[in-house]
């Protein structure tokens, strides 16, 4: 029978378990029991997790224990189940099902008791005193109110649960122990009365030990407690008997002496075992609730608080000791071996009595410490632990589970908000123990504070009112005085404003006076400048007349004279007055006896005959002594002007810079003007007449026809520095006038004399090079510096070397000379010296700093070297070493790169200690006249005047003012425009100023000595495709918006696209390669599918309606197709059936002999065997009879006609194979293709728009829809077809892919059409051509074009290596079979000399026309023997023609000033969109808006607009040039335009125009000197 269980006691135990776990969870979560509700049954997930993590969950412990049972117990249970003796497993599972309703009932009873106690407490009188707190409790500590509250629920059976928020606890283990200790202390305190109170939060339950009712109730309950104690014991024993788990656990507990049960803390040490939980709960109840020997009544419970002190050292009661299991004591008996004593000293006295005491003497820590240190450390740790515990209780610190650390609370966490209620300052037990007196006193204190605050506020208000009244009366008392002060202050402000206005007015008047004064000074300076210019022209005319007297002492052969005269005649016919001015002497009639401009104008208006009659008396002066003295005086004047180069260069430079930087200065000093060349001119009329006479007698002209051995008194033509005249006037004047040649004895020592060719020079000089040597020698003789500005390719290097050789041979001046050149031509100069003048000691100064230091060692010794060649970069870097050495000649190659006079390089070179200076440049004029002035000032920086003052060559502002505006006017209006007199005079004066210091000869000047150069512009019409693409691009809305936007980058991109269209349409839009559109299925497939579908539907029931001819015997049988009559007869005769018949009869006889068995008996094996044998024989007999029947049937078949008759009467297709028509129609496929090859080549030109992929399979019949062949046959045929070569490959390729015809490459482009004609003419006449283009892709098109026409060509572009260029050029020059050399204008110019070609073709023009100029010089240079023709292709009515028109205007500027041929891309800053597009430009684009305002980023922007290959080629070309540019790069500010200052002056004049009478009075007052 099942044991009888005490369910009531088990329910109480369950209730106690739930109360304890709930309290434990509350303490763990909130660290105190404030607001703790004992009736709250927590079912939250956090509560369940808490129990499971700490092994306090009963259900999970039972499940785990069941899983951990041993195999023996399982076998025992299984045996009990089988035998039926064991109880059903449902008893175990239904324990909690029966207990839980009783637990709910216990909760409801407890709730009723609490409610009744609360109601009785409310009826008590207020006079009852509250029992004081026992002495063992801690002092009152203010505990802050928790921030968060958990809502708990008071649970009753059948009622809802009300939840409260409770504070969180940090240390569950410590709180549990403290709870048990506090229970024991409280039980000890209340042991005399046995009164247990129930605590709750709202309302708090008060202690009733002092009331009589409480005493009587306690006595009644004491007897009940004893009886219930015995009941609890009996019920506990009963539960243990009924529950095998508890019983086993108790046995386990007794067996394990180490298993203790300490104050309920075993709930945390049970390792999730439910049996231990129940056992521990029983022992916990006994030890915690019954410390005095009595059992607590079920009606009331006492719950402890964590705020009470711990008392771990109190002895346990007898009951507690009984409840604890006995401990096993282990005693260790160690029998130590006896000591071997050989000496009395070996006897050791034991320090410890036993091993245990010895082991206890060791105290282990992280470090080895003594016992005293260990004890002190333990005390400190206990003190620290106590402080931590107190901190936890008082809320000063908290535990952070995330970081596993203790954290202190900050003041902000502890202090409540200002508007919040004050926190509870006492514990939850003590906050309800205030008496009425306490409340009364507190209320009195509060009211007292309120009265004091009210009193203070009223006093403050009264004080504030008194202050307001006092201030009011003070304000009334000082009103008069304040009014006087305000009036005085107002008057002062008015006086100050009036004074400031007057001062401002006088300041403006002072500025106006300074401006007017400056205008007067400027006007005076202009007058003085004109005076200085006139005097400078006189000096220039005198110097030039002396230089150009070379024919008086020159003994040229007659051929040279004829060539010179022929050259002069050509110049006269061309009407180039500038070249005539350069080759002829200029009369000094520009400066008359008074030296004024009016006289100059009168002389310029006279004809040559009138001038001759006017100055006829000057030709009669023959006094040689006077001429010698005058020439000596002139020489002394010139020497004095040119030798004083040491004092005032800095003054002049600083003066010019100060004028540029500070344009608004109060006063501007007088500029020296051009007095550098004319300071020592005598103003006496007689001297001037003598000078003019001298010039007239000694002047000479190179360009006239005449024989030196002819008439002695014939004088040469002398052209005045008058404005350019028409061609007819020049011809008439030159034909009518002749002058006599002066004798050599009367030659001026300053004149240019013919010098011998130095013996050190190897090689032969050309005539113009010999004239250049004479000019350079005259500069040295006259102690003058100069600029050799011959065009590139005329041999400036050899002329310079010949000058140095002349100085060494004739003047015995061996240097040292300094030659500064760009880095790229440094070695080239050294090689030229070794080639033409090997007698010089040349020092090439380059290398690392150490190498240069080695080269400088000993260079101060005499004749250490004769010539030093270095680069601009190194000469500036080592300028201190070069400045210490005295140089005879300083020669600067490519001197136009020092055009910036503000740069440190210009100033450093200017200060070198040199006797003479020579500048070599091919492009002396760049963008403005300021750069030309910088070169001239570099030659003559300082000049001495008569009065001892020193001044520079000329002021930059004056130079710009004299020549800048008239020259700009000529460029803007054009060369053919009729110029006014002032402009003509200015240009003539500029020529006169430049002529003494500049020798400039173009290739056209020496065309008799060099092959001619002819430029042709070929205008090409656009093809139809080009015109369509060009117009389409221009008509796009996006293009119009881009051009109207004014964005330079967008406009350049548009221009680049237009240039691509002009060069070739394939650059803009490639002609496509057409292919057929390929689809998978053909049209026939869909038709066949539809046809098959319709056919199948129509013949769906054909077998039902059709007639079978075979059944009607209207068809030949199969015997007639296979058998003949003879075969059928022979088969019937030869059939073999006898063996089969014999075997059949034998088997039948055998079967008849045996008695048949109808029903076999399976019990008899013999009878069953005979039955099976009989059946087997019958089966064989049936098979043999069927075989005999089939044999007879097949052998006895007879055909109706026989196959022999059918074949005889049938006409087959093989009979037509051998006929001639059949042989023609069945030719092989290869034969057909070969025969039709010509047709295929001619007519297979149209690519079908669409092709299909299934035509081949359909033609063969192996497509999917064809049922003619089986699938295996189809696969076999397809594999065989794929392995065969396709005979239609060529035809299919021509029909599927349509490549553009090669001839379209030429006919799509107008330039290539013209080029084809031009190349054909050139090749027929034996010419060779260079074709230049800017774009690399055009070179690819040109390659295709030349390959199409079969020309032999070579190619050189930016990708060609530098070392390969020389190989290509040498091969082209040496191999006449190569007709064309195509080059990129960006391929660089170092080491390229293509004199083997005599034709240059510019397919397109470069952005920078200087590149085109350099490309021309590769062919037209020294070494060329034939005339060079230059063809420039320009697309008509396009952007190219407009760009060329604007570029020619820039070229004309060079012809006006110095006749140079170089210009840069700065014309983009001058052009507008309408200038480039012409009539095709949109109407809404402004006319005068330039493309680009700033030129700094022009090259970068152009590179971005070009293709990547072209940009790379340009970059590589610039990288080569960059070696030279690094020598000339300077971070200084560029020279300012001269026009800017003049514009500022005009603006300043307009600013002060139109003054009132007051302002006029003020200005007069200042002017009279009364202001200062």
Curated annotation (Swiss-Prot):
Biological process, per Gene Ontology: chromatin remodeling
Motif DEAH box positions after renumbering to this chain: 893-896
Ranges where the HSA domain occurs: 424-496
GO CC term, one of those recorded: Swr1 complex
Biased composition, class Acidic residues, residue ranges: 569-583, 694-705, 1543-1552
Catalytic activity, as annotated: ATP + H2O = ADP + phosphate + H(+)
Cellular localization per UniProt: Nucleus
Binding site for ATP: 790-797
Helicase C-terminal domain mapped to chain residues: 1314-1464
Gene3D superfamilies, per database record: P-loop containing nucleotide triphosphate hydrolases, SWI2/SNF2 ATPases, N-terminal domain, Tandem AAA-ATPase domain
Region (Disordered): 61-94, 119-291, 304-323, 555-604, 624-675, 694-749, 1505-1556
Biased composition, class Polar residues, residue ranges: 82-94, 152-173, 282-291
Pfam families according to UniProt: Helicase_C, HSA, SNF2-rel_dom
GO molecular function: ATP binding; ATP hydrolysis activity; DNA binding; helicase activity; histone binding
UniProt entry keywords in alphabetical sequence: Activator, ATP-binding, Chromatin regulator, DNA-binding, Helicase, Hydrolase, Nucleotide-binding, Nucleus, Transcription, Transcription regulation
Subunit note: Component of the SWR1 chromatin-remodeling complex.
PANTHER family tied to this protein: HELICASE SRCAP, HELICASE SRCAP-RELATED
Similarity comment: Belongs to the SNF2/RAD54 helicase family. SWR1 subfamily.
Protein name, entry field: Helicase SWR1
Organism whose genome encodes this protein: Kluyveromyces lactis (strain ATCC 8585 / CBS 2359 / DSM 70799 / NBRC 1267 / NRRL Y-1140 / WM37) (Yeast)
Encoding gene, per UniProt annotation: SWR1
